[in-house]
Amino acid sequence: MRLASVPDWVSGVVPEWLAKVMRPKKAAPPWGTMARAVLALWVPMAVAFATGRRELALLTAMGGLLSVTIDSGGPYWQRVERIATAAVLGGAPGLLIGTLIYGRGWIAVSAVVFVAGVSSVLARLGGVGSVTGLQLFIYSTLGLGPLGALRPWWHTALGFLVGVAWALLLITPGYLLSPRSAERKAVAEVYYALATGLRLTGTPGMAGARTALAGALNAAYDAVLTRQASAGGRSARNMHLMAVLNVSHQFAEAAAALRATGETVPPLVTEEIDLFGDAILNERGPTAGALGFGERRGGGGRGGSGEPQLPLIPPVWSTSPGALALRESMVNLTRVLSGKWAPAITPPAAEPPSLRSRMRDSALRVTEQLIGGRIVWEFTLRLMICTGVAAIMSEVLPLQRSYWLVLTVGIILKPDYGSVFARAVQRGIGTVIGAVLGAVILALVPYGPWLLLPFGVLAALLPYAKARNFGLVTVFLTPLVVLLIDLLDVAGWHLAEARLVDTVLASAVVLLVGYAPWPSAWQAHLPGQFAGTLRAVCAYMEQALVAMPAARIAATGSARSPKRAPGEAPGLRSRLRRRAYRSLSNLRAEFQRTMAEPAAVSRRATAWWPAVVALEEVMDAVTATVVAIGRGTTVPSASSVHALTRTLKAVADAIETSTPPQVAGPLPGDPALEAVTAAVRSVLSVLTRDALAVSQGDAPA
C-alpha cells in the first residue's frame, strides 16, 4: 500500500517551502499497528450498532482513538506507560472538566484558556508529559460539545478508560509471545544503521546516515534501559543485550574514523555487520555456539530457508586505524554474541539515598523543567491568547460545532510538534480533503452498520498516515471524527461542512494571532542550538584528546587503548561523544524544521547549513584522532587541544550574545591535531565570514 507523494511538478507551481511542507516522508506500512487500530476502533462501533448504546460506544472508541494516535511503538512497558498516563492523567480528567464547564458560556471560555496554559506547561516534562498535556486539552475541549452533555458524568470517563484498556489489551499478545522482541529489534537497528553508514561513506547520504545512527542509539538505549527498569533486576538476558549494545560504541568510533579519512570498506564487511543485526534480531545468543571466524554456521541467509546465517570475521582488508578498529569491534561483538564474555565486576553499591532525598531531587528536576526560559513562557502566552480568541469566536459566531475551532487551534499550536506554520498549512489542506471525504461518505453510505466499512478503512490508514505527514493524518482523522460525532448527533454531510469551516477559521487564528505578530515565531532558532552543540563538541574534545590519554599514560605508560572487554560499558568519553552526536542530530532536525517555514525564515536557516556540516566534520576528525592515538600515534599536546576548545567556546559565546565572533591569534600547528585543526578552521571560516550577520541574530552569510 502506497499513498501518493506530492508530484515533482508541484515544485514548479508552488514555492519550494510549500512543496516541502506538502511532501510526505517515506515509510513502510506498519501492518500490525494498522490491524490493531481497526480492532481498537471498529469493535466499539460494531457494539454501538448492535446494542443501540451509541453514547457509550462513542466514548469507548474515543479511548481507542487516543491509544492509536499516541502509540509510537517501542518496548511494551514504555507503550503502556505512555498510553496509560496520557489517558488517566490527561484524557479522563479532560472529559470530566468538559462535563463541568459544558454550557457555561464565558466561564467555559476562561476554563479552556486555563487548561491550554496547563497543557503547555506539562509539555516541558518530556514526551509523556507532552502527550498528557495535549490529551488534557483535547478532551476538555471535546467536553464543550455533545460529549459534555452525557450524564451521569462518571459514565464519560469510565467509557473512555474502557476503550483505552481495550486498546492496551490488543498490544499485549505480542509482548506475551516475545517479551524482548522490541528491545532486540531496537539493538539490531543500531547495527543495520552502522552498516548503512559505512556503505554511504564518501557519498551525499553520509550525513543522513550519521543522524539515523544517533537516533537508533537513542532508541536502543531507551528500550533496553526501560526493559531493565520494568524487570526489577539485572537478569542475565538483559545484561547480555546491554553488552551487545555497548559494543556498538566501538563500531561507531571506528566508523567515524573511516568517515573522517573518506576510507570505504569492502561490501563483505557491511554485509557481515548486517548479519550481526540479523543474529541479534533472531536472538542467536549464547546457545548458538561460536560465531564463525572464517566459516559459516547456520542455514540460508536472510531471505533464504532454514536458520539465519551467522556472521564471520573477514580478514584484514586495511591497516588504517579506522579499519583495524572496525575489525576489532567485530571480534568483540562475536565474542559477546557467542557467550564468550563475562559481565564486568562492579563495586558494591553505595547505600541508596533516602526517600526524602530522592523526592527532593525529583522535585528540583521537575521545577527546573517547568520554569523553562523566555521562549517557553512566550509560547505558553501565545497558546493561551490563541485559545482565548478561538473560544470567544465560538461564543459570538453562529458556528454549528464551535468547540472544533478551539480544538484545532490547540492541536496546530502544539509546542513540540515542529513548525507551527507548516502544521497550519498541512492541517488546512488535510482537513479540506478530509472534510470532502467525510461528506462523501455520509452522503453515499446509509446510516447504520454499513458505516463500519469506511470506518474500518479510515482506522487502518491512520497509523500509516501518522508516519508520513501531519496533513495526511488530518485527511483520515477528520472523516473518522466526523463519523464518531455523528453517532451522537446524526447531521449527515453538514457535519463535514461545519468541520471544514472551523478548521479554516482555526488556521487563520493561528497564523494571524499566534504566528505573524510574534517575531520569535518566524525567526530561525538555530544560533542558540548551534552554540550549545559547540560546547558539547568541546567537552568531548577535552575528554577524548586530553584527559583520557593522560589517564592511560599515568596508568600504563602508554596512550594506546587497552584491550577492551567484550560488552564493556561505555566510559565517560563514549557518553560525551554520544551526547555531542545527539546534539548534532537535534541541530539537523531543527534545521529541517526551519526549512518548512516561509522563505524569509528558511533563507536565514539555509545560511547556517555550511556551519552545521563543518561542525560534523570536527566531530569525525576528533574521533579519528582518538582511534589513531589508541593505535599508537603521537598524542597531541594538551595546550594545543585547549587552544582549539577556547576558540570554539569563544565563538559559542559570541553567537549567544549576538556579537561578531573573534579569533584570537593563529590556531595551533600541532601535527597530531592536523585533521582536527583543519576542521575547526572550516567552522571558523564559515562563522567569521561577514560576521555582522551573526551579530544581527540571523546566520553566517
Go through each PLM region and give its residues.
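Alpha-helical transmembrane segments and their membrane-interface boundaries
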Residues: 1-136, 140-170, 302, 317-475, ...
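Long, hydrophobic alpha-helical segments that serve as membrane-spanning/inserting helices
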Residues: 1-38, 42, 50, 71-74, ...
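C-terminal functional regions that serve as terminal interaction/effector modules
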Residues: 472-483, 491, 691, 695
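Hydrophobic core segments of alpha-helical transmembrane domains
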Residues: 72, 116-119, 161-201, 506-519, ...
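Cytosolic/matrix-facing juxtamembrane and C-terminal tails of multi-pass cellular membrane proteins
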Residues: 479-485, 503-508, 524-554, 565-579, ...
